[in-house]
A protein has these predicted regions:
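Short hydrophobic beta-strand element within catalytic cores of glycosyltransferases
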Residues: 276-280
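Nucleotide-activated donor-binding/catalytic signature segment of Leloir-type glycosyltransferases, i.e.
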Residues: 219-239
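A short, active-site helix/loop in glycosyltransferases that binds the activated sugar's phosphate group
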Residues: 113-153, 162, 217
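Short, small-residue-biased leader/transition segments that mark boundaries at the very start
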Residues: 1-3
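Aromatic "clamp/platform" in nucleotide-sugar-dependent glycosyltransferases that forms part
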Residues: 260
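A charged, aromatic-enriched C-terminal amphipathic alpha-helix characteristic of glycosyltransferases
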Residues: 23-26, 311-346, 352
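Conserved donor-binding/catalytic core segment of Leloir-type glycosyltransferases
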Residues: 165-188, 194-201, 207
Length: 353
């Protein structure tokens, strides 16, 4: 049997030694390995490659949708199993939520910025005909697909890290926060944090670790907050294997991410792995006993949570840091990811016998 696996990317299969700059690099290889243990020959295609020249017909296709499946339409054997891999909330919801954030920004500052995370291509009713769906996130985020009659669906657990240098029992600055994200600064809520920390939280420190420099309109609009505000430290992209990231994790008590849509925020798992306490929107995909979930992302709500939790005593903060690391170890380890993929794969196979 053959399976075409277009779940993520081909980089980790090509590079002999690849840095774990993102969870999906290791996860892609591990997913292919697990599928191979069920008797399949696994091929891998980057989900962004729309011109892949396929040589075989396949008995199973696992891919991101709507982008990751259509190129296989003419290369499926009769009875080919189709599994949708959902790494975020419903794209229609994601796009709508980002638009709300951009509209709110326009009302506040009179500037219209470009969307970064939304998509004009959304998932359609065809997903109802799939043999299974694998999703990263929790039930709250998976409910964004309630508009569909979903096929048998299985949760895939995102994975954190086991940093051998991470420390739980150290005294960090309770007024130091880190924003740790990738692209889509408004989507992730950086605009809200920059305005809050520059105007209302001047005695707090915010480290900004993200790709804001690659978003020219955002970069220009928030240049003053980023580069002319003493309590905001612009770091840009930070390699999680670097000494810089380690130093930030020893300084900052909290990681904060008021995102409008996620699957299960990998950057927050990374921060938790390093001993930081997460304050996040419920859209980040965590349960209430795992993180500090914001009830909403209004400015006054974020402000209140920042102030409230920064006033906790050091004993509470150290216990919370320890709890963050324990949650990653017990619920979001690499082993947890592997077990969830095995369970999801076997679940689809069992339902189609």
């Amino acid at each position: 049997m053959c399976i075409r696996d277009s779940i993520y990317i081909v980089d980790p299969f090509i590079e002999k030694a690849f840095p774990e700059r993102h969870q999906n690099l290791w996860q892609a290889k591990e997913m292919a390995r697990i599928i191979g243990t069920r008797g399949y020959v696994v091929d891998v295609v980057d989900y962004m490659n729309r011109n892949a020249k396929l040589k075989f017909n396949y008995d199973m296709v696992v891919g991101l949708i709507p982008r990751g499946i259509d190129i296989y339409t003419k290369h499926m054997n009769p009875g080919c199993l189709r599994i949708a891999y959902l790494t975020s909330m419903n794209l229609a919801i994601t796009t709508g939520n980002e638009k709300i954030r951009l509209d709110e920004l326009k009302q506040r500052r009179g500037i219209e910025l470009s969307p970064r995370r939304g998509s004009s291509t959304v998932i359609g009713k065809e997903i109802e005909q799939f043999d299974g769906a694998w999703y990263i996130g929790n039930k709250y985020n998976f409910h964004s697909y309630d508009c569909f009659k979903m096929p048998p669906s299985f949760r895939i657990v995102n994975s954190g890290y086991a940093f051998d240098w991470a420390k739980e029992n150290i005294e960090r600055d309770s007024k130091s926060f880190v924003f740790f994200a990738s692209s889509g600064q408004v989507h992730k809520g950086l605009d809200l944090l920059l305005e809050l920390f520059s105007q209302h939280l001047k005695d707090y420190t915010l480290y900004v670790c993200s790709g804001y420099e690659q978003e020219e309109d955002f970069y220009q609009e928030y240049h003053k907050e980023l580069y002319e505000t003493s309590n905001i430290i612009p770091m840009g992209f930070v390699d999680i294997e670097s000494e810089t990231f380690r130093e930030i994790s020893y300084k900052c008590t909290f990681a904060i991410l008021p995102s409008c849509a996620e699957g299960c925020a990998g950057s927050i798992l990374t921060a938790m792995s390093a001993g930081m306490i997460p304050i996040v929107s419920k859209e980040c995909g965590f349960e209430d006993d795992e993180v500090i979930n914001l009830p909403d992302c209004k400015m006054e709500t974020i402000f209140g949570y920042v102030v409230e939790y920064s006033q906790k005593d050091q004993n509470w903060l150290k216990n919370a840091a320890k709890h963050s690391m324990e949650i990653v170890h017990s619920r979001y380890s690499k082993l947890c990811f592997s077990h969830s993929v095995e369970k999801a794969l076997d679940g689809v196979l069992a339902n189609t016998k």
